[in-house]
C-alpha cells in the first residue's frame, strides 16, 4: 500500500546551482492541498516547470530525463529500479485537491497555479543551513506576503540549523528578517534531537537525528546535518529523508550514524520502512579527502550493511527502496549518477544485501512509497 508521496523539486548536489535539494511530502491520495518540505534548495521555479510539464505531458519526451553528458537526455529506466512507483510531474492527487479548492485553479495561468501550490507548503524541515539546502526557500520567502490569504510557514530544524538561519540569513543583512515582521507569517522553530514531534498538518510523527557533515575549513569544528524519520501513525510505515552526511569520524566521540541505525532497527520493523532518501555525492574514484563531508558508494553501502546486520533478516534488505540524492555534477565523460548507481548496485550484491531497490532521485518526478 502506498503511504507517502514524495515530489523531487531538487536533488542536485552542485556545483551547478539549478535544482538543489528540496523534497515535498504528503500522504498518498489525500484531498488536502497542504504539503511539507524537506530542505529548500529549490522552490517556485521548479514547481512552475512541473506544472508546465503536466500541461505538455503528451508531447513525447516523458521517458527521457536531462543528463548533459554522453547525451543531453537519457531514458528514465537508466536511473531507476524497475519496481519503483514513479510519475513525471506533480501527483494527480495534489492537482485534483487544488482543483477542488475552487474553479479558479483550472482557469488560472501557470504563475498563479505556482503560487497556489507554493502556498500549500506550510512547514519546512531543514537538514542544515548550507546554501544548496535553503536558497530556494529564502528567495521565495517574500511571496508569503503577495496574497492577503496566504498561509503562514514554519521552518523547523535542530538548533545547529535554526540558530544559523536566524543569525546569518534572516538578519536584515544577507536577507530581510521576515521572521520579525508583524504578521509573523514566517517562523523559525527548534526541534530536539531524537524527540518525537507531531507534524502540524498530517497524522505523522517527525523524529530528527543529528549526523556528521564534515568540519569547518577555517575552524576545524564539526559541521552537523540532520536525518528525519517520518512515521505515519495509522499504518506505522516510515520513510527516512537525509541531509548531507559523512561516515562517523574515528576521532569523534559521537557515533551518530551508529546510534541512528540502532534506533531504526529497534523501532521500525523492516516491513514498515518504505524507503530511504540518502546522499551519495561522489563516485568510488573519489579519494576520502575529496568527499568534504559526503558519502561515496563504498561508505553508503557500509552504512546499509550496518543496518542489514542490525535487522539480521535472512532476506537482507529486500524490498527496501534507496533513493540516491545529492550527486555532484562533475565534469566527467559519463553521467556521475549512472556511475554511482552502477557502483552501488555492484557493491550491494557483493555484500548480499538482498533485493535492494536502488534508484536515483530525479528532479520533476513524484515517488509513491
Curated annotation (Swiss-Prot):
* Gene3D superfamilies (alphabetical): Ribonuclease Z/Hydroxyacylglutathione hydrolase-like
Stored CDD domains: class_II_PDE_MBL-fold (cd07735)
Range of residues in the leader sequence: none
Task: Show the Pfam families listed in the entry.
Answer: PDEase_II (PF02112)
SUPFAM superfamilies in the record? Metallo-hydrolase/oxidoreductase
- Any idea of its EC number? 3.1.4.17
Task: Provide the top EC class.
Answer: hydrolase
Q: What PANTHER family does the record point to?
A: 3',5'-CYCLIC-NUCLEOTIDE PHOSPHODIESTERASE 1
- Additional information: Present with 1400 molecules/cell in log phase SD medium.
This chain belongs to which protein, by name? Answer: 3',5'-cyclic-nucleotide phosphodiesterase 1
Q: What's the source species for this entry?
A: Saccharomyces cerevisiae (strain ATCC 204508 / S288c) (Baker's yeast)
Amino acid at each position: 500500500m502506498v503511504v507517502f508521496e514524495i515530489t523531487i523539486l531538487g536533488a542536485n548536489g552542485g556545483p551547478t546551482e539549478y535544482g538543489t535539494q528540496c523534497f515535498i511530502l504528503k500522504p498518498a491520495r489525500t484531498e488536502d492541498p497542504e504539503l511539507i518540505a524537506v530542505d529548500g534548495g529549490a522552490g517556485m521555479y521548479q514547481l512552475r516547470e512541473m506544472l508546465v510539464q503536466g500541461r505538455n505531458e503528451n508531447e513525447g519526451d516523458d521517458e527521457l530525463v536531462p543528463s548533459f553528458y554522453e547525451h543531453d537526455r537519457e531514458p528514465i529506466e537508466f536511473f531507476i529500479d524497475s519496481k519503483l512507483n514513479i510519475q513525471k510531474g506533480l501527483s494527480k492527487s495534489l492537482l485534483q485537491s487544488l482543483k477542488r479548492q475552487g474553479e479558479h485553479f483550472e482557469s488560472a495561468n501557470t504563475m498563479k497555479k505556482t503560487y497556489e501550490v507554493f502556498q500549500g507548503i506550510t512547514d519546512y524541515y531543514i537538514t542544515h543551513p548550507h546554501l544548496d539546502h535553503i536558497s530556494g526557500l529564502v528567495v521565495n520567502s517574500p511571496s508569503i506576503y503577495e496574497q492577503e490569504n496566504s498561509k503562514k510557514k514554519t521552518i523547523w530544524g535542530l538548533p545547529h540549523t535554526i540558530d544559523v538561519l536566524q543569525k546569518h540569513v534572516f538578519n536584515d543583512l544577507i536577507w530581510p528578517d521576515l521572521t520579525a515582521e508583524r504578521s509573523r507569517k514566517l517562523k523559525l522553530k527548534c526541534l530536539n534531537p531524537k524527540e518525537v514531534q507531531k507534524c502540524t498538518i498530517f497524522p505523522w510523527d517527525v523524529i530528527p537525528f543529528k549526523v556528521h557533515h564534515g568540519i569547518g575549513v577555517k575552524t576545524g569544528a564539526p559541521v552537523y546535518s540532520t536525518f528525519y524519520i517520518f512515521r505515519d501513525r495509522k499504518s506505522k510505515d516510515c520513510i527516512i529523508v537525509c541531509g548531507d552526511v559523512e561516515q562517523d569520524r574515528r576521532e569523534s566521540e559521537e557515533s551518530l550514524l551508529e546510534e541512528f541505525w540502532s534506533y531504526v532497527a529497534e523501532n521500525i520493523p523492516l516491513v514498515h520502512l518504505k524507503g530511504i532518501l540518502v546522499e551519495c555525492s561522489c563516485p568510488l574514484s573519489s579519494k576520502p579527502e575529496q568527499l568534504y563531508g559526503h558519502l561515496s558508494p563504498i561508505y553508503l553501502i557500509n552504512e546499509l550493511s550496518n543496518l542489514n546486520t542490525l535487522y539480521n533478516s535472512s532476506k537482507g534488505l529486500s524490498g527496501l527502496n534507496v533513493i540516491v540524492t545529492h550527486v555532484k555534477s562533475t565534469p566527467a565523460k559519463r553521467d556521475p549518477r549512472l556511475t554511482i548507481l552502477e557502483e552501488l548496485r555492484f557493491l550491494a550484491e557483493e555484500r548480499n544485501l538482498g533485493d535492494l531497490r536502488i534508484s536515483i532521485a530525479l528532479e520533476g518526478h513524484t515517488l509513491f512509497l
